[in-house]
Structures are given as structure tokens and as C-alpha cells.
């Protein structure tokens, strides 16, 4: 019999005597899976299997006695030789009605290679989903002790063919041929004609040996012809839990294919993991430079028309009156006249300060406005008690205590790793310095000023001459002494941090975005802290707290004593312009632990003043920090305690779109990511110290690396809202952002921002490159 396509009809034909009892339901399960199950589990306990086929012999074949025709064409395509080879044998011995032939048959049809046990079933799997049919012919004492189960295909639907054969009224189904069950007018006869598939023709029935029996029977012995045909469409719900004989081994396999929904099973695919993919939206390639200038003028009115070209010249050549104390000036140093240098002229007019030239006046101005203007804490404070409490809290909130490493950190390997990171110039200086440890002065530092001025994103550049940043740094040999140890300690700290606490240590844009990937896309209350004069406001409390933290990770002995001594009372010298001064405490901005010490000073101070144990996310980097709490979480203002205990002046920002290290934290397509501040970027495009096309090419390479997120219009749309929220722009910045992207990602357009006519120079950026 041909296979019914599309799994339309699954059938079992049971022809039985008058006392046939089914002790369990007859069940057909079919679909596309999987498991080999016996068709007749145990028909009679430990009875031999005798299977008849459509060849010469039939079991129980005697014309003169009560006979039974166990004609069960199980497999249509089996030849006589195949039957013999498979031990599907024939028996011609006569049997009485009480010794009726027991017919059992196990048929398992699966696709190649899933679940099959040849030794158990004794025959090969029939390929191509051959016929699923069973004909059971039994005598009056036949009892089925187990259900008849058929499992085939690969999809999983369970259908009950015969729920209770004798408890329910059986259906007698005739077909459209000559014979009908009980088919004689004058006598009671039985025609065991039960076509498995309703569309079988007469020739098909004959060829399949679904034959008719014409032997006379009394009315009480009329053969009951039952036929159950179940047509299953691709249904969504089938209740299989009431069928107790469903093998337990199927459960694990079923759960991978089916989606459970209460007590039902939905036939659909279940994925063990899902990934949400969001495509980028291309930014329109349109825009002009006036679009950018118009938005900047509207957001920072007056900044673009200020004239500061001669500010540095005025400071260097005219008299300066100011009060200075606690310092010494030496006027015998080299005098350098002010120089006007040629450079490219930017098209955009912004408040980007000009690059300064070093001089004694600039050093004194910077030293007075920076180092001598730090606040001084008035009042008594139990530093040891404060440090002990904050470190205990840090162990619970910031770190996994079992990951804290206190082993020896001064090893050859750690020193070699630090040495490999040094530049060729630094290595040459270290080799040339032959001083012994006892000859090194750990308390004397060098002093210098940075020529680059940080741009301010407000209106103060119109009225203020910004002070330069000061750098206090030790000799190279001092950094070489502490560098490997501090580097190893910071690596241990990072390894022990909890996942929601982030130390932004030289992270790339992609690495920083990975730290916020776990955040769910609902709103948080963001706490953004802005410290003023952070480095210069440090006291002994900060230094002792950081050293106490480093002690937890192995800093001890002579290294601890020398490091502590080098941070307290120091003497600074400007060897170029003759400025000398004593400094008490303060963070030395040029030693090997400037960034790490600033980071952990801020983190420990905020931990002491804020409930960081309830925070969802904390990120610290230098004097910048960002903390996320639940929306609506009530937080008291920490500025008073920070000033009274930690000597820190601060402002707390509560913007709708928080920022960290010059980047906005934005939720885009349900995922949080850091996006660079476009207002600061536009301000930098007005710089006047770009010398030539080679420097411009370096800037272009850096922009393409740091601002690649701008290539997605969805990012620009979210960034537009953040700019309006923070800078109170009178209108949307989307036109300026689109114009900005149009010019910065193509060098031929980018050079128009600086009136440059040269060609792009491809080169590798220096590790310390900043613009």
C-alpha cells in the first residue's frame, strides 16, 4: 500500500472475535521524530510471534475446522525471500479455536539514523515511510494486555484510535466493494474487509490481501469489524498527557520541538537562545557647514564671535599683578619670546582655546589658580575610623572577596610586562640613570604646564582667561620603581570587581559599551557627580584610603612605606622657568598611579556618602563617575558630606540623559551604549593649531575610530534629544548632526573644514595621541 502523503490518514484495523477485550487504548503517535516503539508490546505474555503474509501459507489454515485467517500484510514491498531472511515466518499447522494463532508484529518506521534497535525488533527499518497498518485476527479468548502503539515520522501528534474498544459502541465501516461485514441474507457471515485507507480501489484491496472470509458464523459469533480512521490536519493543540504509555524517553526530545503552554502543547519551534538584531539606519549624505555653525551659535550665543588670538601674547608681554605665596621664583632661566605659528584656518568659529606657549608667567598663573586655590578642610576628623568603615563596605559592594589576590606581586614577569609597554625614549632614559635606591629622592617632583586648554561648553570663555593644567611628575627611575607594582595591583583590582562596578581603564568605545550591555531597557535614575579641583583637593584621608585599598591586594613592606612617603610632603621644581614650591598632599598628576588613585579616591568617597549597595551600575574613571539607581529611588544630596569629610567640592547633575567622560549614555533599540558628545566635538573642530595635512590626517583617523557610532541615524536621533536636554538648545540639532556626519567620514569633505588642499596621509597613530 502506498504511503499517504502529507501525513493525512493514520489507521489501524482490528478484526476480533466476540470476547475480545482491550485492556488499554490503541494509540497512534506520528509526526517527524524519532523513537522506536513496539507496535504490539506484549500481546500474550512470552508467546511466540507468528506473522502471516501474502504468500502461499496462512497460519491456522484448515477447511474442515474452525479456522482463523491471520492475513496481515504488514509490509507491502517484502518479497518471499525477504520474509524468510527476516524470520517473518509462515505456519501451516492446523489450530483449534482455543489455540488461535497469536499475531504480533512490531513495525518501526523512522527516517534514517534517528533511533533504531535492530536486535530488539529483528528487522531493518522500512525506508520512505512505508505503510503504517496492522491487522489483528484473533480467536474468542484473545486478550490484549498492553496498548497497540505506532510511532513514526518526525512531527509529534498523538491520536487515540481506539479509546476503549468494548466500552464504547464500535463503528462498523463498510467500503464500496462487493463484500460487507455480516454480508449474507440467508446466514450470518462475516467479511473482514476493512480497508485501511478509504481511497483504496477494489484491485488495491485484492493486491493488499485485505481479504474477505465467507465462512458461516452464528449471529452470536459474528465477527466485529472495527475500523478507526483518524484524519489529522496540522493541528496546533493535541492533549497527550492522558496517554500513560507515552514513553518517558520522549519527553526530553519533545521539549526541544514543542512550546509548552499550560496543559496543552503547541506544535511550533522553540529556540533555546534568541538574539535581537537591529540594523543600522543610513545617515543621509547631505548637509553644509553653515548648518553646523547655525546650531552652535544658537546653543552657545556669543562664543563664536569672541576674539582671543592675542590673549597669549598679551599675557606674555605685558605686566601682571597678582598675589603669590608659598613658592619661590628664579628669574635666571632662559627667556623665550612669544611666537606666532602658521597653521590651517578652521571654517567653523567656536570657543576652542588657542594652544598656549610655556613661560614663567603662564606657570605662575596655572600654579596659583590650580595648586594654591585648593580648599582646605577645617575641623577634626577620625581618619582611621572612616577608612576602616569604607574599606569594609567596599569589600561587600565592589569586590568578590574570594577573588582578591594577595600573593607576591614583585616578580620578574610583572616587571617584564611593564618594561615591554615603555617607549624607546623611556627605556633609554632608564638605562642612562645609574642612581642607587638610597640616592633617589622620592619626595622631589618636576613641575610643568600643559599647553592644550580643555574647551568649556558654556559661555565663560567670553570673559575668562582659562588657567592651564599643571603636571607634577617624578623622575623616570621613580616611576620604574613603583610602576610594575602599581600596574599589577590595578590588574588584580579589576579582576576582583563585581560585574556592575566598572573601572574605566583605557577602555575602547566597544569595550565600554560591553559594560552596559546587561542593563534592561527601562529608565534609571542617573547620578552624575562633577568634582571641582579634584586632584588638588586631596588630603591625607584620600592617600591613606587608597593605600589601605592597595594593602588588600598585596602592597606592603618597604614599597608601602616609600609610596606613602612620596605622596605626603613634596617639593616641586619647574626646571625650565624657575618656579619652586612645597606641596602638602595633593595628587601628583604625573606619577604612575595618577589615574588609578583618582578613580579609587572618588569611588571610596562616593561609597561613604551614597547607598551604592542599591545601585544597578557604577562606572568610575579618574574624577568622573556615573551611578544608576532604580527610577524614583530617593537619594539625599551627598555634596555636604563630601565637602565636610572628604574635602571635595562637587555638583550633582540629574539630567534625563546622563554622561560619563564626555559620552552620553543612551538607550537605542532597547540597548544602552555610550555616544560621544557632539557639542564638544564641534567645539574642537574650531581649533587653530593644526599645522599641516599630516596632522589633519591623524585627526581624521582618530575621528573615524572614536565617532563611528555616528554612522547610525538612530544614534543621531537619540543624541539630538540628549543635546537639547543638557545644553538647552532652542531647537533640534539633527540638521547639524547630519551635516557633521557628511563631512567627517570622507577626507575630501573633512579637509574643507580646515581649508586644506593636501591629500590624505595614512599613518599609525601614536599611543598618546590626543586632539
UniProtKB/Swiss-Prot annotation:
It is found in: Host chloroplast envelope. It catalyses: RNA(n) + a ribonucleoside 5'-triphosphate = RNA(n+1) + diphosphate. The keyword ATP-binding does not apply. Keywords: Nucleotide-binding, Nucleotidyltransferase, RNA-directed RNA polymerase, Transferase, Viral RNA replication. It is an enzyme of class 2 (transferase). GO terms for biological process: DNA-templated transcription; viral RNA genome replication. It holds the Pfam family RdRP_2. CDD domains: Virgaviridae_RdRp (cd23251). Its EC number is 2.7.7.48. GO terms for molecular function: nucleotide binding; RNA binding; RNA-directed RNA polymerase activity. Residues 524-637 form the RdRp catalytic domain. The keyword Membrane does not apply. The genome of this virus consists of three linear, positive, single-stranded RNAs encapsidated in separate virions designated RNA-alpha, RNA-beta and RNA-gamma. Three proteins (alpha-A, beta-A and gamma-A) are translated directly from these genomic RNAs and the remaining proteins encoded on RNA-beta (beta-B, beta-C and beta-D) and RNA-gamma (gamma-B) are expressed via three subgenomic messenger RNAs. RNA-directed RNA polymerase plays an essential role in the virus replication. Belongs to the ssRNA positive-strand viruses RNA-directed RNA polymerase family. This is RNA-directed RNA polymerase. It comes from Barley stripe mosaic virus.
Amino acid at each position: 500500500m502506498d504511503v499517504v502523503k502529507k501525513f493525512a490518514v493514520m489507521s489501524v484495523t482490528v478484526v476480533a472475535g466476540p470476547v475480545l477485550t482491550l485492556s488499554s487504548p490503541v494509540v497512534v503517535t506520528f509526526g517527524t521524530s524519532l523513537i522506536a516503539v513496539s507496535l504490539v508490546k506484549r500481546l500474550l505474555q512470552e508467546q511466540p510471534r507468528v506473522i502471516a503474509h501474502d504468500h502461499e501459507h496462512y497460519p491456522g489454515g484448515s477447511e474442515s475446522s474452525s479456522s482463523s485467517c491471520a492475513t496481515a500484510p504488514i509490509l507491502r514491498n517484502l518479497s518471499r525471500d525477504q520474509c524468510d531472511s527476516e524470520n517473518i515466518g509462515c505456519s501451516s499447522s492446523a489450530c483449534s479455536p482455543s489455540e488461535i494463532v497469536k499475531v504480533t508484529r512490531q513495525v518501526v518506521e523512522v527516517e534514517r539514523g534517528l533511533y533504531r534497535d535492530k536486535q530488539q525488533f529483528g528487522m531493518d527499518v522500512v525506508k520512505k515511510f512505508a505503510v503504517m497498518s496492522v491487522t489483528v485476527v484473533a480467536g474468542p479468548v484473545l486478550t490484549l494486555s498492553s496498548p497497540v502503539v505506532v510511532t513514526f515520522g518526525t512531527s509529534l501528534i498523538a491520536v487515540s484510535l481506539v479509546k476503549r474498544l468494548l466500552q464504547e459502541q464500535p463503528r462498523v465501516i463498510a467500503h464500496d466493494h462487493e463484500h460487507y461485514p455480516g454480508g449474507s441474507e440467508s446466514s450470518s457471515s462475516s467479511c473482514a474487509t476493512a480497508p485501511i485507507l478509504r481511497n483504496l480501489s477494489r484491485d488495491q484491496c485484492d493486491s493488499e490481501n485485505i481479504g474477505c472470509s465467507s465462512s458461516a458464523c452464528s449471529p452470536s459469533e459474528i465477527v466485529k469489524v472495527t475500523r478507526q480512521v483518524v484524519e489529522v490536519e496540522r493541528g496546533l493543540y493535541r492533549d497527550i498527557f492522558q496517554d500513560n504509555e507515552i514513553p518517558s524517553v520522549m519527553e526530553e526530545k519533545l521539549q526541544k520541538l514543542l512550546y509548552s503552554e499550560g496543559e496543552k502543547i503547541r506544535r511550533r519551534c522553540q529556540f533555546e537562545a534568541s538574539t535581537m538584531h537591529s540594523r543600522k539606519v543610513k545617515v543621509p549624505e547631505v548637509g553644509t557647514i553653515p548648518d553646523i555653525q547655525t546650531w552652535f551659535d544658537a546653543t552657545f550665543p556669543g562664543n563664536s564671535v569672541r576674539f582671543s588670538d592675542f590673549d597669549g601674547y598679551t599675557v606674555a608681554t605685558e605686566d601682571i599683578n597678582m598675589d603669590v605665596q608659598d613658592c619661590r621664583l628664579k628669574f635666571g632661566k632662559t627667556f623665550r619670546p612669544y611666537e606666532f605659528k602658521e597653521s590651517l584656518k578652521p571654517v567653523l568659529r567656536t570657543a576652542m582655546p588657542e594652544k598656549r606657549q610655556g613661560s614663567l608667567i603662564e606657570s605662575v598663573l596655572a600654579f596659583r589658580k590650580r595648586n594654591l586655590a585648593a580648599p582646605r578642610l577645617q575641623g577634626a576628623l577620625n581618619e582611621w575610623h572612616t577608612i576602616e568603615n569604607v574599606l569594609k563596605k567596599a569589600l561587600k559592594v565592589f569586590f568578590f572577596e574570594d577573588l582578591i589576590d594577595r600573593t607576591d606581586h614583585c616578580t620578574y614577569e610583572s616587571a617584564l610586562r611593564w618594561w615591554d609597554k615603555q617607549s624607546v625614549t623611556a627605556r633609554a632614559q632608564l638605562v642612562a640613570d645609574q642612581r642607587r635606591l638610597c640616592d633617589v629622592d622620592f619626595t622631589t617632583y618636576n613641575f610643568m604646564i600643559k599647553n592644550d586648554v580643555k574647551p568649556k561648553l558654556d559661555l565663560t570663555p567670553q570673559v575668562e582667561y582659562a588657567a592651564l593644567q599643571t603636571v607634577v611628575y617624578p623622575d623616570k627611575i621613580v616611576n620604574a620603581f613603583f610602576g610594575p607594582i602599581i600596574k599589577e595591583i590595578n590588574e588584580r583590582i579589576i579582576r576582583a570587581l563585581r560585574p556592575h562596578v566598572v573601572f574605566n581603564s583605557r577602555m575602547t568605545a566597544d569595550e565600554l559599551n560591553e559594560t552596559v550591555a546587561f542593563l534592561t531597557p527601562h529608565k534609571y535614575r542617573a547620578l552624575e557627580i562633577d568634582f571641582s579641583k579634584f586632584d588638588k583637593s586631596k588630603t591625607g584621608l584620600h592617600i591613606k584610603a587608597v593605600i589601605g585599598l592597595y594593602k588588600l591586594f598585596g602592597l606592603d613592606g618597604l614599597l608601602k612605606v616609600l609610596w606613602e612617603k612620596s605622596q605626603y610632603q613634596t617639593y616641586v621644581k619647574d626646571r625650565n622657568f624657575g618656579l619652586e614650591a612645597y606641596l602638602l598632599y595633593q595628587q601628583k598628576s604625573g606619577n604612575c598611579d595618577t589615574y588609578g588613585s583618582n578613580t579609587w579616591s572618588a569611588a571610596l568617597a562616593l561609597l561613604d556618602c551614597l547607598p551604592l549597595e542599591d545601585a544597578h551600575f557604577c562606572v568610575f574613571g579618574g574624577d568622573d563617575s556615573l551611578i544608576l539607581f532604580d527610577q524614583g529611588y530617593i537619594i539625599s544630596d551627598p555634596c555636604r558630606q563630601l565637602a565636610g569629610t572628604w574635602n571635595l567640592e562637587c555638583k550633582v547633575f540629574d539630567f534625563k540623559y546622563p554622561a560619563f567622560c564626555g559620552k552620553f549614555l543612551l538607550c537605542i533599540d532597547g540597548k544602552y551604549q555610550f555616544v560621544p558628545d557632539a557639542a564638544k566635538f564641534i567645539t574642537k573642530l574650531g581649533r587653530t593649531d593644526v599645522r599641516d595635512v599630516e596632522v589633519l590626517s591623524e585627526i581624521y583617523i582618530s575621528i573615524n575610530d572614536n565617532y563611528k557610532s555616528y554612522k547610525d541615524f538612530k544614534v543621531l536621533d537619540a543624541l539630538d534629544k540628549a543635546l537639547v536636554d543638557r545644553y538647552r538648545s532652542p531647537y533640534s540639532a539633527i540638521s547639524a548632526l547630519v551635516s557633521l556626519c557628511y563631512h567627517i567620514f570622507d577626507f575630501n569633505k573633512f579637509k574643507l573644514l580646515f581649508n586644506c588642499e593636501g591629500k590624505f596621509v595614512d599613518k599609525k597613530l601614536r599611543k598618546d595621541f590626543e586632539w
